[in-house]
């Protein structure tokens, strides 16, 4: 099982990203192995916003369509943040006083990963390392 965060999705689609080739190769390998990929609605919110902000419209639109196809084909699972998970993420926010830069979306991702027992994540964020 693999969780992909916003950075992973953006780097996969943006050829200008320094790690684009590495991420694309890794993603294709996971696909070949029929690995299950997870993300959340919060991650996709960030991803869709940034795709259309950073990339030409046609590339951003194709990216969203590919994500939708992955969901329809059962390759990508979207975990929808529940009110309970939202509350748990709020508790984490209060707990990690020493990490003011961690986003609330990242905290919800941590909650979901813990629930699903996912240990592998495609990210550049230090808090997941």
Q: What is the meaning of each model-derived region?
A:
Residues 21-22, 70, 75-78, 122, ...:
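Ribonuclease/tRNase effector modules and their secretory precursors
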Residues 1-39, 52-66:
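Short, well-structured N-terminal submotif of metal-dependent ribonuclease cores
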Residues 76-120:
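Active-site neighborhoods of divalent-metal-dependent phosphate/nucleic-acid chemistry enzymes
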Residues 9, 44, 128-129:
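A generic structural signal for short hydrophobic patches within well-formed alpha-helices
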């Amino acid at each position: 099982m693999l969780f992909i965060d916003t950075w992973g999705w953006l780097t996969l689609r943006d050829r200008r990203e320094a790690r684009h080739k590495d991420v694309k190769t890794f993603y294709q390998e996971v696909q070949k192995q029929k690995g299950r990929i997870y993300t959340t609605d919060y991650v996709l919110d960030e991803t869709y916003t940034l795709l259309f902000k950073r990339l030409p419209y046609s590339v951003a639109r194709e990216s969203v369509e590919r994500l939708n196809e992955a969901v329809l084909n059962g390759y990508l699972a979207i975990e929808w943040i529940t009110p309970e998970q939202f509350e748990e993420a709020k508790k984490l926010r209060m707990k990690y006083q020493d990490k003011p830069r961690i986003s609330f979306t990242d905290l919800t991702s941590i909650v979901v990963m813990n629930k699903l027992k996912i240990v592998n994540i495609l990210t550049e964020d230090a808090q997941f390392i």
